[in-house]
Amino acid sequence: MAITDWPENERPREKLLTRGTAALSDAELLALFLRVGMRGKSAVDLARDLLQQFGSLTRLCAASAAEFSAIPGMGLAKYAQLQAVMELARRALAEQMNDADVFESPLAVRNWLRLRIGSLPHEVFHVLLLDARNRLIEAVELFRGTLTQTSVYPREVVKLALARNAAAVILAHNHPSGAAEPSPADELLTRSLKQALELVDIRVLDHFIVTAHAQPLSFAERGLL
């Protein structure tokens, strides 16, 4: 049955407009993005197929162009639209961090990190460079590694922070395995970076471990800084 044949109060668009986004299921929200279905399937049916195929919204949004386009009814145009939506979300969160003290919007920092690096299949190390008022100057991917290790050199982090005239930094890296617990190597790296940056009067405010399906783990909250 086409969505236009549904009772008006059950159609995703009408439901969103009258009851808000929280009233919609993942499939209904995705159907609004898809707009149309395909022969024999409504947009909601197609959305359910996509979620079943990828297993979650996170994996769907992290799919490659080839993986996404392999699904019947999808293609490069839809893939480009999805990536544009994701990038708009990242930029909106980055604006919040640019305009205010990051401690006034800690959820924005966490959400930005999850969107940026949470679903990557390889490990990356990011440095968020902050000014004296803890506003974001720039976020930089400094190193990229394998699934199990990445090479992070304190001198490169210090060099970057000085070049951008940063007063403080937030460190972040992802665990593609999905386990957010810090390893002994993670703790050692954090101490090394903090000590190196302290020598040039740059504060390390936090270090986050980011995964796809959980809130980033904060070293500061764990008492590991």
From Swiss-Prot:
Keywords linked to the UniProt accession: Hydrolase, Metal-binding, Metalloprotease, Protease, Zinc
Gene Ontology BP term (one): proteolysis
Database matches in CDD domains: MPN_DUF2466
Protein known as: UPF0758 protein AZOSEA04420
Family: Belongs to the UPF0758 family.
GO molecular function, one term: metallopeptidase activity
Short sequence motif JAMM motif: positions: 173-186
Organism: Aromatoleum aromaticum (strain DSM 19018 / LMG 30748 / EbN1)
Record-annotated MPN domain positions: 102-225
Residues annotated as transmembrane: none
InterPro entries referenced in this protein's UniProt entry, alphabetically: MPN, RadC_JAB, RuvA_2-like, UPF0758, UPF0758_CS, UPF0758_N
Native organism taxonomy: Bacteria, Pseudomonadati, Pseudomonadota, Betaproteobacteria, Rhodocyclales
Gene3D superfamilies the UniProt entry points to: 5' to 3' exonuclease, C-terminal subdomain, Cytidine Deaminase, domain 2
